[in-house]
Amino acid sequence: LGARGLGGEVPKTWQLGFAPGPGQLVRHLSAKGFKPDEMVQANVALSNDGGKLRDRFFNRVMFPIGDAQGECIAFGGRVIGTGEPKYLNTGETPLFHKSEVLYGLDKAKAAMASTGVALIVEGYTDVIALHEAGFTNAVATLGTALTRQHIRILSHHAKSKIIYLFDGDAAGQRAADRALEFIDSSMTPE
């Protein structure tokens, strides 16, 4: 974690974790008495056609994804080293709809309200780095899919500006182009 700029108090502040090698979580939860269907429903395990369970997340730094009040509703994991996908989120659930959640909103909403400004980035580590640098009004879209619901949420907390800070790669440029589609008559792009 330290090599990725996530050392010191960061893991504690952001409740970061680690998902070890494959099969360890399923074995641990089974030993604690959890049933296979409970693990699948909780979105921490997947079941193959033969009914064999496997960990949804392994060999990943884990980021709890909270709602606006900070209650954990999902997880995101970034692979350690090489591997695909680089980032993996919990699947959609009755509580978690990726298009309606902004990572770090619980920690950023007060700063958004006091400054009137929201900074929006693509990923977990971007949010954490900005908060550590003093930009506590930053949130992430959990990838590049900015939605109208995200804009509504941001507009509720940040009354003056929404500043997009997407990555400079092709995916980031596409995200910025899509974000411009959501600008309405009450917003002025800068």
Sequence positions of predicted segments:
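Non-catalytic interaction/clamp surfaces of large macromolecular machines
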Residues: 2-12
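Phosphate/diphosphate-binding loops
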Residues: 162, 167-190
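Conserved beta-strand edge residues that scaffold enzyme active sites
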Residues: 15, 144-145, 168-169
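Terminal amphipathic helices with adjacent charged low-complexity linkers/tails
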Residues: 11-13, 18-19
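Phosphate-handling DNA/RNA-contact segment within nucleic-acid enzymes
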Residues: 22-161, 176
